[in-house]
Amino acid sequence: MTSSPVSRVVYNGKRNSSPRSPTNSSEIFTPAHEENVRFIYEAWQGVERDLRSQLSSGERCLVEEYVEKVPNPSLKTFKPIDLSDLKRRNTQDAKKS
């Protein structure tokens, strides 16, 4: 009886068959996506509420801001954006078209 080599599946890391995101300005959000966004939003609102509360009452720190001791050089040009403003602008652009 001869033994044949075991076949192996090799992945190259590329996904050619994955669906592409919509190219038009109207995005499609699944209920799971909306639930995840809502969870993150509510959790962050809780953190901000706790931080405001602790700052006004002077109580022991429950929320602590993380600041890197050695900044990442690749983030030197990073500029945070206001997501609410970005969404508002995208909504206005969609209404114009």
From Swiss-Prot:
Q: Which GO terms describe its biological process?
A: gene expression; negative regulation of gene expression, epigenetic; regulation of epithelial to mesenchymal transition
Query: Which residues are reported to carry the modification Phosphoserine?
Result: S21
Description of how the protein assembles with itself and partners:
Interacts (unphosphorylated form, via the PXDLS motif) with CTBP1, competitively inhibiting CTBP-ZEB1 interaction. Interacts with CTBP2. Interacts with MCRIP2. Interacts with DDX6.
Native source species: Mus musculus
What keywords is this UniProt entry annotated with? Acetylation, Cytoplasm, Nucleus, Phosphoprotein
Lineage: superkingdom: Eukaryota
Positions occupied by motif PXDLS motif: 80-84
For whether the record's keyword set contains Metal-binding, the answer is no
Q: Where in the cell is it found?
A: Nucleus; Cytoplasm, Stress granule
Protein name, UniProt field: Mapk-regulated corepressor-interacting protein 1
The tissues in which it is expressed are: Widely expressed (at protein level).
Give all Phosphothreonine modified positions. T30
Q: Which Pfam family, an example, fits this chain?
A: FAM195
